[in-house]
């Protein structure tokens, strides 16, 4: 029962029920109160009643409500003296997520449902667009009764299961979008970056159990569903499912990605299976059981959860690290430094505590990574960034990192250090030296390695610039975190330690350090060997008769070819390589802009490079004619530019394209000398031939009349009758032989036929009558079959209203006029925005730089060993007998000649392969796609994607468009191409498995992470030198590096027709080759009947200014007088003229000025405004600019190239000369006839 309410005021006195009451009490008169006072009093009483009588009962007993800051309850006075114990220190709360992340988490929590398997979350299913999507690789049941009852369909190609959600849930689902501009998006773990068509997150963000989570944009729409991921350097690439613009699902899976279902990966330890993130001996770790921990890691070397097991072994202690940096440093506490052979210690060969194992210089800007036998950032007792450790004999010693120095031709700058590795910025040199000072002792090691500054881009600068342009490059990351690359470790082999042996009581005594084990080997005279953990006395009397080996199984060492391998079956471990090559952005120099000078069809570049700079050019026509030259000093270069265009690229500047215009210095419409100057600049050879012809005609015309008159004068002076034996001229004789003739008229012909041949007379008479009958029959057939024929033609026209052929040139529109009987013409414009030739490709293999792996050799003292086959690429193994190795100054074996050494070597991918590799593709016939802008009538459609195959129709609004196929089946790609970085090369590479040493393809694999590695590097093992533990070998240089030096120019620099080569997918864009047939079906709604078309009267077109072959260089004025003010269309009937604007409002009375582009000297085009038409004529001048940065229109016809003025002058010239010739001939004939008649 709930308690009664407690009253906080004193109770009233009890009333006596038997008290006397007057039955007729006197009536009391209430005192007079003003109305306002009475109202106030009533209000006061009502408030008092509410506060006293309407008290709420106490709340029932139950859990208190959650509050951020609960109010303290009142306590009695005695309780104030006793202070409660201080509350436990609460952990610092994580910062609240941002607004976008909160919205993302809210939407995800409402629309995403976990998939349960064995009581734990294995993945997620999300509801998008009225459907539920569940990853196919995620097993389990959706944690929702309604969704779990849905029957899902499988789409294995997308790794998804999907089904329609119930009707009650369709209004509460997420919406998807195909718009994915580059930038950042949201998901459960924060921001996701989308760049280069890939979703990436920082490494370590997301993982197992996140499959099925959605990626949202700022509006809460789903852009992708996560399926898995793969680590790529410092970031993780996500495998996702997205949607394209047509709403079709698209799967994007990077190479090597793994599904992110929360499937527990198991590891093994001595026949015990356990989760890799929970070793069976938890909370034991490396500090407590070092040997067992190393053994556990070695047995799970090939497990895909090796990183989890390593992390659990290193972080198993409860002590919290200060920062994540120290956490990754603690991985190398499993290893120790060592002493190894160095070829040059400053004086000679020696066993050095800082021997150089490897030098890598594959990054740009002169950064190298050095691996040594010393360790950096570690002390003997823990992690310390300011110290380095090395082996001082048999003990480990630490000194300050300031004592370390690195140099090539000059001292290097130390960038970072970690584990066995140093990252340094070095000047160019042929050798690398690493050393340190330990008090008075100085240790150095020098190896031969060429260090050079590798510039980025097309300019050979020698120092990093202060400013410039950012270009992709390769760099070594400075992070020490897990980057996905490993260095191989193993437990060290046995090394003789003579300090463990001593003479005690004339016997050899073996002293064992505390907590260690020693293996001994004695020969006095019988051979005795064993392992002891306490002091042991042998029967030998001389220290030389025994060898003692300290068993060091608590630390790993690098699996070096300069260290002997341990006896028996030795397992391997691995640690992360700290500084790995990654893709980055580097600042490259930008050469000074060239000084450009334009002349007629000539481009002059004045170049002033600061350092050697590459200049490349190519023609944009069918013959690319590429050039490539390095400019080292200021110079001037000239290039011929044609109407097809020229592209030049100077240094790291973007490529520029220029086109020649039909410019000239003269005037094609001026005086003859101006016409000659104009055509001489434009067509020099043709002009010279024409001038020579005209001069020859003039000379002949002048010489012939003079000779004729001289001959006539001679004939007139010497008549025929006075000359003896005179002969008649041949011309007069021929004229005399001609018989005069006379033609009869029609009546005489008919009279002759009637009298001589009446049959032929009637035949001639009936011919006109037969022709009249045939014409009448044709007209009758037209009346009978004409309507049906027109209907058929109308149906055909409705199916494809307009067909034409347009040039395959981007940016130059095709314009036409579509006419229909009874309708106003409709303007049609089709412009190519982008074209792509996309071939089908097949990846044969990838190739990259290899790395030779040399394991520790097996040294068998006083015995023999043998090689075994191992599945490694280009694996080489050889046993050498009669070796006598020394180890750190002492003999390693008893025997002199009976010892054997087994040397091994093989090839593997270098660490740079993940970012620096080439892909070999076989190319087959592909497809052609285009993006077009279409305008018909008042309808405009932008960026429509169509297939240029002549078969696939594209829906453009209510119109249907079919484009293609191309008139020329051409492609810039050969049958084999190589993709390297962002460039594509036509290269005839060898087939898979047939690579040759030292050439392209000496290292091959299907993907960058696959195990099908093929190598042919001519690897040969050499006999080791006496007294040194090492594995010498010879090998051919990397064929990939050789190909990079000799690869030549990429397709972007040599492809004809101005093609631009792009990737993802491989394609050639905007190739101006051939022509494209088009066919478009225009709907009836786009046509306007003539009765509804506005009319315009009094049209007159006047060209006020015109420059041909220029970008809308013509200006014309059109006086108009429309019936009513409307917006009308202007329609051109010619193709060589283009209007800048096709629609404009026309006023009641006034004029309209429009711009047009033409390639003719004398433009004469018909312009139609509504139903009225007018012809525009005029003269155009040549353009003043010789070179422009846009493609200009050029005419190729002879009649259009020669102006009317030039034709007029030519006619006058030829016409005057002909007149003189004709007059001379007539005079000659007259004189000859007169003389002839006088003679006879």
UniProtKB/Swiss-Prot annotation:
Active site: 137, 159, 211
UniProt protein name: Structural polyprotein
Disulfide bonds: 848-913, 861-893, 862-895, 867-877, 1059-1071, 1101-1176, 1106-1180
Domain notes: Structural polyprotein: As soon as the capsid protein has been autocleaved, an internal uncleaved signal peptide directs the remaining polyprotein to the endoplasmic reticulum.
Note: Structural polyprotein: Translated from a subgenomic RNA synthesized during togavirus replication.
Region spans: Necessary for nucleocapsid assembly and virus assembly: 1-35
SUPFAM superfamilies: E set domains, Trypsin-like serine proteases, Viral glycoprotein, central and dimerisation domains
GO biological processes: fusion of virus membrane with host endosome membrane; proteolysis; symbiont entry into host cell; symbiont-mediated suppression of host gene expression; symbiont-mediated suppression of host toll-like receptor signaling pathway; virion attachment to host cell
GO molecular function: RNA binding; serine-type endopeptidase activity; structural molecule activity
